[in-house]
Structures are given as C-alpha cells and as structure tokens.
C-alpha cells in the first residue's frame, strides 16, 4: 500500500519535513481555506501541489472536498453547490489528482466527548463516552425529543453524570462535541448548533438516502468521465446521533451505496476505526466483499468499553479491529489489481495516533499529533512487510 499522511496545510504543527521523516511518500490534504461549496481553482490546487512536490512528496488523496449542508438537506442553492463540486473535480483531475475522500454525515464530521483521555501508559487518546454524550444531549443542549432515544435507566445515569459536572466540565464537553475538529470548517454555539440540527427535522433515513442518491447520480458520472475515484468515508460513530440520520455505517449500507450508483468511480474510504465501533461489523468480510471499490484506507483501531456504545482509540494494532485480517484482504486486492494491469497502490494512512512522548508538551490537532501516527505507520509498514513475505512471496 502507498504510505500516506494527513496534513492540514501550512498551519499544521506537523511540518512536511516531519512527514518525509516519518517515511510517508504521499500526502492527504485539502484546501481548508476555501469555504465549503466554493470551487477549488486550478491555481489554488497547483499551489498546494507545488508546496508538496518541493519536499519530494505527492498529493495522493484529497480529504476532503466538503459537501455543503444545502446538498445534504436539498435546500437553498444545493444545485449550485453540486455544480461547483463538479467543477472542483474537473479541476483536480486536470492537475493529476485522482482520489477524493468525502463524507455525507449531517452537521458534524466526527464526534468525541474527550480529546485527552489518558491511557494506562500516560499517552492521550480520543474517546466517546456514551453517558457523557447523553448528559450533553439531554441536559446541556436539551435537544427536543432527545428523551425518546434513551431508556429511563440511561436518562437517570446521564442525569447523575450531569449533576456532578462543574461549569468548566460543561464548557469543555460542549466544546469537544460541537466546536468542530481538524478538517471541519464548522464550529457552533449551542443555539447555532441546535439550528443546524433543526434543518434535518423531517428528514428520515429513507429520505436522506434519496439525497445521497441524487448527489451520487450527479457527481459520479463526472468523476468517471475525468478519471477520479470517489471514496465515501463511513459515519463516525456508525449509528444515528442527535436525531440525525446515518446511512454509511454497515455492510448493508455499503451494498445499497454500490447498487444505487454502480459506476466504478463510486467507491469507499475503508476506515477501520469508524466501521469497527459497531460490534456487528465484520471488517474482514466487508473489506473482502467490497475490495474492488476500496480506493483509500484509514487504519486505526478502537476499543469498545463496558458500555458497548462507549469506545476509545486503541493502539493501532490492538483494540477490536482485526488489523491482520483487514490488511491481508487489502493486499490481496492490491495484487489482484496488479495482475489485471493496475499498478496503482491503495493509499493508506495511519489514523488518530495517541499524543505521546514530546508531543504531550505541544499544542497539537486532536488525534493528529506526529509521534503517535509515526508509531502507527511504522507498525503498519512492518505488518505489511511480514504479510507480503509469508503470504504473497514478495
């Protein structure tokens, strides 16, 4: 697989020199300074591309070209935003960039309650605490109708959690959930956040699927025409939250996705950490079944906790994800493609490393400190080497 690294642009505390020293050859990045919905010009794309090439790196994957909320809700100027998206794809293709990762999650890209969860070894990880999240939804945000999604026992547990919170605790939890994370343009006050949630009133799972289907049928033919492979990222976490629909969470969702728009340009970002949170998801089976549609890979592992809806980011080769089996399935697909004349490697990046060692003293993007990802990339490099020697005689 191609070893890549997510980079948040010139303001990322991890430099391109750091990326090279980590052993990555490809960069996963986006033009975060361009507002959601606006066209990425050839000039801006080439400017970023040149910045990477100066350091001997290539722009392997765009993560992400964000999808405007109007497109997801099919309101406002959604057709204009779709037309802009098509032009951005054409511009990327003209610059030689051919993989675009994106997601179709409403409002929030990914959600955690704790961005500094201390592990037994003293490193820090990202965590989703279901009880804390329920306390936020029920007693801080006070989302109308939220009580319908929790049992009386869950509500009592959340209330007890909320009652022992200080004002500082409430502010921190709120910020963690709604202030947005790296790669996301959004950051909301509680009132603004609720207003965004309200945009999805009346949009059921089935209705939301029709919105995604419309987007796919508009965008994917353009991607196919210009040689871009679209790679949708799964929901994180892979279940409905905050009354919002989620439609890219399971193997059945993946099948619907392929059936809805069967062109080869319509594919997946296989994020093991996102899919792996759901115990029912057999990641090896999913990787094998949709191998020919996997165009980009995020490798990380999560550990489900005593409350099965709570989880934290585990060490990359630990946790609930069968990383051995998944990597073997992906390499099998890579060799199959090679036998059929496609020598392109599947780009892989280590996802969400722990904050550790010297990075504990630094200001870092949550989940995206250097050393934890350096460790993860080195571990995946070793795993891939061993698999190739033992199973593929390479």
From Swiss-Prot:
Keywords: Iron, Lyase, Manganese
Keyword Membrane: no
Top class in the EC scheme: lyase
InterPro entries: Man_deHydtase, Xyl_isomerase-like_sf
Cofactor: Fe(2+); Mn(2+)
Role noted for this protein: Catalyzes the dehydration of D-mannonate.
Family assignment from sequence similarity: Belongs to the mannonate dehydratase family.
HAMAP family: UxuA
Protein name (record): Mannonate dehydratase
Source species of the chain: Histophilus somni (strain 2336)
């Amino acid at each position: 697989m191609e070893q890549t690294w997510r980079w948040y642009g010139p303001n990322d505390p991890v430099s391109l020199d750091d990326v090279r020293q980590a052993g990555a050859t490809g960069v996963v990045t986006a033009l975060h300074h361009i507002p959601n919905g606006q066209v990425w010009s050839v000039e801006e794309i080439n400017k970023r591309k040149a910045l990477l090439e100066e350091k001997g790196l290539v722009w392997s994957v765009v993560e992400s070209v964000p999808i405007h909320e109007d497109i997801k809700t099919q309101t406002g100027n959604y057709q204009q935003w779709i037309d802009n998206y098509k032009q951005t794809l054409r511009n990327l293709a003209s610059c030689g960039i051919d993989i675009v990762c994106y997601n179709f999650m409403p409002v929030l890209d990914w959600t955690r309650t704790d961005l500094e969860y201390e592990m037994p070894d003293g490193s820090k990880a990202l965590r989703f605490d279901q009880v804390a999240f329920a306390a936020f939804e029920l007693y801080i945000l006070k989302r109308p109708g939220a009580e319908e999604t929790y049992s009386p026992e869950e509500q009592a547990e959340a209330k007890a959690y909320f009652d022992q919170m200080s004002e500082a605790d409430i502010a921190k939890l709120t910020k963690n959930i709604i202030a947005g994370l790296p790669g996301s343009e959004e950051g909301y006050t509680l009132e603004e956040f609720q207003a965004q949630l309200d945009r999805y009133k009346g949009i059921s799972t089935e209705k939301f699927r029709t919105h995604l289907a419309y987007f796919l049928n508009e965008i994917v033919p353009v991607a196919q025409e210009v040689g871009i492979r679209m790679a949708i990222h799964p929901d994180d976490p892979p279940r409905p939250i905050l009354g919002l629909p989620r439609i890219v969470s399971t193997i059945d969702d993946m099948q619907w996705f392929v059936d809805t728009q069967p062109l080869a340009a319509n594919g997946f970002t296989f994020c093991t950490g996102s899919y792996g949170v759901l115990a029912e998801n057999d990641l090896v089976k999913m990787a094998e079944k949709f191998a020919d549609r996997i165009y980009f890979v995020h490798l990380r592992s999560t550990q489900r906790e005593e409350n099965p809806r709570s989880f934290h980011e585990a060490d990359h080769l630990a946790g609930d994800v069968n990383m051995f089996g998944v990597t073997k399935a992906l390499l099998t697909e890579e060799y199959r493609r090679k036998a059929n004349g496609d020598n392109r490697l599947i780009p892989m990046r280590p996802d969400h490393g722990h904050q550790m060692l010297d990075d504990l003293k630094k200001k870092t993007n949550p989940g995206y400190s250097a050393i934890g990802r350096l460790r993860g990339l080195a571990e995946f490099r070793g795993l891939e080497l061993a698999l190739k020697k033992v199973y593929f005689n390479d």
